[in-house]
Amino acid sequence: MSKNLSNLEYHADERLGRSTAWKLVTTCPAIVRHEMLNPRPSDSLALIMGSCTHAATLEPDLLDKEFAIKPEEIDGKSSRTNHYKEVFESMQSRNPNIQWLNRSDYRTCVDMAESAREHPLLKTYLSDQETMIEQTGFFECKGVACKVRPDLYNPGAGVVIDIKTTQDASEQGFRKSIRRFGYAFQASYYLNALRILGLKPKQFVFLCVEKTPPYLTAAYEISTAEVERELIRVHDACDTYKKCMDTGIWPGYGDDIKTLTLGNYATNGLLSISQTAEHFNVSRTWVYRMIKTHKIPTLARGKRKMLDMTDFKNAMRWDAEGGKNGKTT
């Protein structure tokens, strides 16, 4: 693992990273190839604020070397004037490694970071000199040159921590983020990478901080079974990437006509109590008990209660594992 690579340099490196690997298994190679040849700008406000929050959380002493507050006025001139634009462009050219934020956005990043740093888990490992912060590792998986850059890794405890800024850090809210952004895949990718690099990670923790005051935090881990299951898709991504690189062929969705079965998606993934009982071959009473025990959210559709099939499947697994309220024991 190396500390000699900046965040911008890491993202510019052409080795296969987690984000590209995730896109290979959730979109198609043609889209991945297009994005490789036409990279998205790295100066979007969301990306800059995310990077600023990470820097302020993990390495606040280095924050001023990478981020600065954009002046509201220059020589009494507003940002709409030519004088302001000329002087600010000169400031940017003299400081090519600095990313600029307005005062309000910069303050938000710092406030989120301060909240995250107060979480007992992060506070413990940030005070440990053994902890590795944003170090880069290069490795090979399935014959593919890959890269990894965990936010924080403590080799003594074997703990990996990834900082996530989110609109909703509640259990239900973060479950949705896990599905939408492939966080189980990310955990599997990182743990696999660190093991290939000769390290011994034991636990992958997501430390979430909300983007709005009071910037609440929460820490989550995904069940070991789900993370291990995602390793199949990590390997699939590497195999697909290698095949595309070797052949120069980056296929799209295919030209064949495909037959789609809507199934549960016809009701947007929702089932009534009776449908849930029938689908899972259980009693209605047992369904109600699971809803109450695991706090499964329901939605009223007329006189019927509807619930998400994925939420119920997760609850069944937690129940079988002896867990409760979305946490395994």
Residue map of PLM features:
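Metal-dependent nuclease catalytic cores that hydrolyze phosphodiester bonds in DNA/RNA
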Residues: M1-V148, T259
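Short helix/strand-bridging catalytic loops that position acidic/His residues to coordinate divalent metals
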Residues: Q167-F181, S223-T224, K295
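Metal-dependent nuclease catalytic regions and adjoining charged, substrate-binding loops involved
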Residues: F181, Y189-T267
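Polyanion-binding surface elements
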Residues: A266-W286
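Major-groove DNA-recognition helix of helix-turn-helix-type DNA-binding domains
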Residues: N281-M306
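A short, Lys/Arg-enriched interface patch at domain edges and termini
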Residues: T310-T329
